[in-house]
Each structure stands twice: as C-alpha cells, then as structure tokens.
C-alpha cells in the first residue's frame, strides 16, 4: 500500500510522544539471552578475540540496521536480514503475534527479536501491540483456515525425519528437553502457525527468511508435511480441534473387497470391505493380503488440480476400472478384458475435487495404472498423477494452540502501520513505502560504556532490550571499540570463519578445531541410510580442514547451491542448499585461505598412464574397488564414494597429496596408506615412483563415466 509520508511525518511527533509515555520505567523481564549457535562455537576457541565475536553479534543482532556504518566497517559486519513481514499475516496467528510483540523473550526462548516494550505500563503496551497486530495480520491476506490434518503415524514419520536428516544439528533433539545455547528453540511453533503454512515454509525458507540462516533442505511436499505435523504435534490434542472437521492427509484411502463371480465393477456402497488402509499412489501393491482373482479395490480421496483447465485422465487395466471425479464418470474401462487403455476429459477448476478410482479382477492377470494430461501438456500417454496432489479427509484436525477468530480492523491497521515506522521496526523489517521516522546514532558515534544504552545495565526508554548475556555485552563493546580505531578488510581465513559461524556450518562441520556435532549427538542422531561399515566417516559430515585446497571452485559452488556432486549417498544427514552469492563468497575465501592455486596442477593425459591407473584401481593393483563404486557399478565390499565423481570435484594436487598420506588430511580416515615411507608395493611400475603411480590413477579417473572398468568389476546385468 503506498504511504503518504507527509501525513506519517505529521503523525510522527504525536506518535513518538505517545511512545515515550509507553516506555516509562518498569520491571525488566528476565529471559534467556539471544541464541546464536555459531557465536557459541566461537566462544570455545582461544584464538578468536572478543572483538571478532562482537563483530558477528553486531550483524546477527542487526545493530547496524539502526546504527549506520562506513563501508570499511560494513565489509566486516554482515547484516543478517530479518524475516520478511510483507506476508506475515498469511503464516502467523494473530494471537501469537500479540503475545510475541508484548514480550518476545518470554514466548520464544533465545529469540533475536528485542523487547520494544520493556519499560511500558501494561495498558499502554497492550494498546500499542493491538495496533501493530492489526497491521501485521493485514499483510498477506490473513492466515487461511488449516486444511491439513495429522495422525500419530504422520508424527512418527516426521519424528524419524527430523532426527535423521540433520535438523537436530541446529535445533537439538526434540525427544527430550534440550536447553542449550547451541540449539534454536522450536517449542513455540504449535501456537504460531498451521501445518499448511509451515509446510510451505519448509519447502522454500528463503521466501520469508531471506537471510539464509534457515537453509533449503530440498524437502518434497510429503517430507515437509510430515515434519510440520511432528513439529506442531501438540495441536493434535488441542481442545479447539474436537469440533473441527477432519484435516487432509497425504495419499488416498483404499478399501479391498473379495467377491466371488465378478465380471464387472460392483456397487461398492452395498459392500463391506475386507480390509482398509491408505496408499501414496494408485497401485495394486497394497499393504494387504490379496487373493489372485475375484477381488475389487476402491481408492477414494481428493485430487488437487493445480490450475483451471481441461484435464485428460487415462486408465490402463486388466480387468475393469473406472475414474470418477466430483461424482462424474470420466473414464469407464469396465468389464472383463485383457490390458486395455481408456481415457476421458473433464474441465476442472483449480483446487480440491472428489476423486475415486475403482478396479476389479475377475481372473487371470491383474494390472492397474492411472495417468493424466494436465492443461498444456503434450503426448498421448500421460504421466502419473503426482502423489502430493492426492489427499484424504481422514486426518485429525490441527488448529494452532490459543488461536481464535480474528478480523483485522482497517483503522487500527492504519494506526499500526504508522507505529511500525515510528518505532523503527521498518529498520530491520523493510516494507514498501515505509521508512523510519528518526535516525539512530552512527555506529562509530556510540559510547560502549553508556549505562543506559542498549548495552547498559539500565536500558532507557525507547531503546530495544535484547536481554544479552554478560559475555555478549562484553564482546559487543569490544567490537565497538575496535571499529572506532581501525577496520582492516577481512582476511580469507576470517571470511571463512565468519561464514561458518553466521550460517552455523559448525553444527555439522569441523574446521581448525572448531565445530562438529557433540559426541552424544553424533552417536545417537547421525547415521547412515543403509548398513555400511565406514565408521564415523560414513555418518558425520566431513571436516573442512584443507577444503579450499581439495575442491575445484565450481564444484564447491555446486555442492553449496544444489544437490549435484553430493557423493555421500550413504549419509542420512543432508547437505543444505545456500544462495549463489554466499557460495561464491565462501568458495573464493576458502580457496585463498587454503592456498588453492598450489593444488591445481595435474598430469597431462596419456593412454599409457590411464592404463596403469586402471590396473592400480582394480584387484591386480591397490584394489580401490573394494570400498569404492566406480562408474555406477557396485564396489566389491563397501559401497563408498563413486570414483567417477572424483575428477569433477577434486583438485589434482590435493588428490596426489591425500593418497600419499591420507591421515595427514583426515586423522580419522579409514583410507589406507598405500605408499608407506614413500615406497611403492609395485616397484616395477613407473619406476616405483609414488608420485607417478598416483598421477596414473588420476589420469584414469579423468575419464569419468567413460573409463574402462578395472579388473574385478563385472558390469551390472552380466
């Protein structure tokens, strides 16, 4: 909405006067200090100065959003973007907003949001918060009534997912109480949002959290829904849900019938099912025992059409089948027959439609497949209906705790909008057309020892209260003192360290003795996706010591931004995706910090060298294929990293040094030392030179997926 800044300005003086009345002396709320896991890791390293830690806090707490700084300081202080509030009304309940604005620390343990009303009298505070709530809930069209439901089974799926793919690294285990400065609390979520909104957020976190501190885990719709149900599981027992309609669950319900003498689809309404259940897809492979003939199956639920238009549905079956949408028979493929395809068209509006598939088998072979052609698609065969578009209304309703009907008042919303600017909320949370009405002091003008400032013992009216711990205040003061003197550019090593702290890479990765999951967490929650004897290397994300020397720059960028070149297929913990800008900055910095150019030079290609390398990789050489897959073929014993991926990921110089002395680069590696004391077990090949022999392996690996298979590997299917 465009803002009349003149009116806002004229309103500003009166509003600020009112705010001064709000901010009179009162009791300071005692709560947990801001939780910054990356900062907590830095506290454990004696080589990191107080001012360096304070620089991180200045950015993460957004001090420079209000206190402008010079370009030199800006290079060292990276501002964490606050949540985007332009559509907050569509994802957060008004009741949570009200309680949170009154006292953020009391409702979200360790929140980075300061308490604006820490000196306000209750009546004045509540009035101001009411206006702000009406304004914020008007953004985004309001929170939609929850559609998705849950179940105990869905909670268990989400529980298993949360505690396996790496969520515990940042948020801690949710199966037991966990109050720790290394973990970001999630206890408030059940009163904050709905399964629908949280599911959308988990699939695209950067839309509302542009800072990237919550990364993209490449969750599909089913995974996001399961995680959301788990995180909001307290809503399943919400008394407000007792009278609510059932919620949506993924998949379709099915009913299985046994009927003798079938030669056509029966009237299902007159029958009692032999077994019932749910399925993610339309298939005959159901979790029930079926007999070979004279049975029928009915699949029922909702189909969510993504767009309005003409849809073609196709049924291929042996024997009969039928597709019914909104009570209308769209495809009739009934009767006794062999494999036969039938199709039909129907115009659908975007949204949910009653959906039913019927099938029977009278005898002989049995087959059923259902496909569709959405608007704009081509081809005659169609494609399977995406499973995330199929739901049933069988879930327990899930309603946010403490929620109630709410109607945004336009007049109160306008007052809240003006207050949002007057209180400088817009400094951290930019909104189109709004600007702060007053400017704070510049960063270099601040007095760190001001007792009534943000870092003082008695924070005066009008200033935000972060409830900082003593060591956090000390570090912030040290950073302010340092920045008043000199601001040298960040070194590559400092850039790497600051990135890993700000984005909490230390939760999973260790570098320079910092970070990595605790022993207790690693043993319990960092596992493999299948049984494989790789020890800690197979479970724990790799150390990042020497990572700049190891990776090709483009490979590292790809690892950080996409799911490409993620070669540890056996590791349950997922590598998140980050922004291209972050990936570019980090890959450049870590390359410079680890002297990347020194490792770029590799051997020239020759067929003779590749042939030697082929021998070394096979069972007549070093037998690398015992533990490594190669060109998509299984290894002989342990299904480790595929060697065909090495050339695209790794620098040749690092590869050479690693093979000659693996333990120097990873003390916990199971990679054997093939050239002990610089001596080769194959003295007759390439003059027994370890360097030459390693280079031959590199030359062979440069062929990637086109490499001829080494001795000991038989292609699949042969």
List where the protein language model places each region.
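Cys/His-rich metal-chelating microdomains
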Residues: 69-70, 173-174, 431-432, 511, ...
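Electrostatic cytochrome c docking/interface patches
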Residues: 32-59, 138-163, 237-238, 244-245, ...
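Extracytoplasmic electron-transfer domains, predominantly the class I c-type cytochrome c fold
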Residues: 32-49, 73-141, 176-235, 407, ...
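Short, cysteine/histidine-rich loop/knuckle motifs that typically chelate Zn2+
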Residues: 65, 169, 427, 507, ...
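N-terminal secretory signal peptides that target proteins for export/translocation
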Residues: 1-8
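Short tyrosine-centred short linear motifs in exposed loops/low-complexity segments
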Residues: 62, 166, 223, 307-313, ...
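Bacterial N-terminal signal peptides
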Residues: 12-25
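Extracellular/secretory pathway-exposed regions associated with glycan biology
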Residues: 35-38, 42, 227, 231-312, ...
